[in-house]
């Protein structure tokens, strides 16, 4: 977990509840995956690039660049939101789990994430 994630849990979170994260974009996604080995990120990118290729002749949505339609498809598969339990004031995640912002454009812009904390 990042230092910011830990600080957020210590300072702002309820003892029990949920953290809901929502990314406000259609060519990026949020995911939870292993964060101990950076090869996981590399492998995940390779897998998605193999499954959903750029520059396919059947894409009709091409005005925003050849990487845009594949980015939409990848984001649809992964999803735009996460819900993480909060237990004893901390994110209740596995020891190897981390939150990923999955950028699927080759040159993605700034991304905005809405974080909603619910609980008591």
Model-derived regions, located:
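C-terminal binding/interaction regions
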Residues: 94-103, 108-120
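Glycine-rich loop at the start of a catalytic domain that most often binds anionic cofactors/ligands
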Residues: 29-41
């Amino acid at each position: 977990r990042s230092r910011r994630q830990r600080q957020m849990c210590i300072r702002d979170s309820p003892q029990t509840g949920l953290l809901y994260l929502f990314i406000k974009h259609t060519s990026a996604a949020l995911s939870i995956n292993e964060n101990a080995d950076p090869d996981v990120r590399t492998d995940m990118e390779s897998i998605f690039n193999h499954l959903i290729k750029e520059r396919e002749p059947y894409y009709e949505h091409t005005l925003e660049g050849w990487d845009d339609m594949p980015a939409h498809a990848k984001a649809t598969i992964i999803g735009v939101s996460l819900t993480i339990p909060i237990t004893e004031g901390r994110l209740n995640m596995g020891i190897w789990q981390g939150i990923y912002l999955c950028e699927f454009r080759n040159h993605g812009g700034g991304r905005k994430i809405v974080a909603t904390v619910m609980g008591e």
